Design a protein with these regions (language model features):
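ABC-type nucleotide-binding domain
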Residues: 4, 9-11, 16-190
Length: 190
């Protein structure tokens, strides 16, 4: 049954690979409505230069997460455009887009696998040395090595064997390993 469900967001028939990017992000007159017409964002204009950091703050339910989810096309805009280096994200393949954008979600997702494989998910061809370096950068390496099975420790379904902070750091290590040109941290403590 699940395999027959069509995704809500699909590549355009003429979608092309996103070329290597500098990382300029533009939201041009962006509005977004959820199904049923619930408006969340109206006429947003943002320009984020490569290397620039932007913090979006506001109350819960104010649309911050939705704003973050438009860039990697977890949702499509209702009006306007979201562009990387002047290229509308709707005109490129989702796979090429998501290779250059890394997202640290509020809700960390871990697989029922080892710590090593959960970090490796950021870049499946990574070596063990690269995985360990990413963990050091995320300041979780010492904690991992202190576990009885180290990097081969099984984390359980959705990481139930780990604390919330450990899950967050593993997710950060995954992003360091991926090393995307554009990084979205949808979590204040990140």
């Amino acid at each position: 049954e699940l395999m027959r469900i069509q995704p809500d967001i699909a590549d355009a028939p003429d979608a092309r690979e996103l070329p290597p990017v500098c990382g300029q992000v533009d939201y041009n007159d962006v509005s977004f409505d959820y199904a049923g017409g619930v408006n969340v964002l109206s006429h947003i204009d943002l320009h984020i230069a490569p290397g620039e950091t932007l913090a979006v703050v506001g109350p819960s339910g104010g649309g911050k997460t939705t704003l973050c989810q438009l860039l990697p096309r977890f949702y499509d805009v209702t009006q306007g455009s979201v562009c990387i280096d002047g290229i509308d994200v709707r005109t490129v393949t989702q796979a090429s887009l998501r290779r250059c954008v890394g997202v640290l979600q509020q809700e960390v997702f871990l697989f029922a696998d080892t710590i090593r494989e959960n970090i490796r998910y950021g870049r499946p061809d990574a070596t063990d040395a690269e995985i360990e370096q990413a963990a050091r950068c995320a300041e979780i390496d010492r904690e991992i090595r202190a576990m009885p099975d180290g990097y081969d420790t099984y984390v359980g379904e959705r990481g139930v064997m780990l604390s919330g902070g450990q899950k967050q750091r593993l997710s950060i290590a995954r992003l360091f390993l991926k090393n995307p040109q554009i990084l979205i941290l949808d979590e204040a403590t990140s």
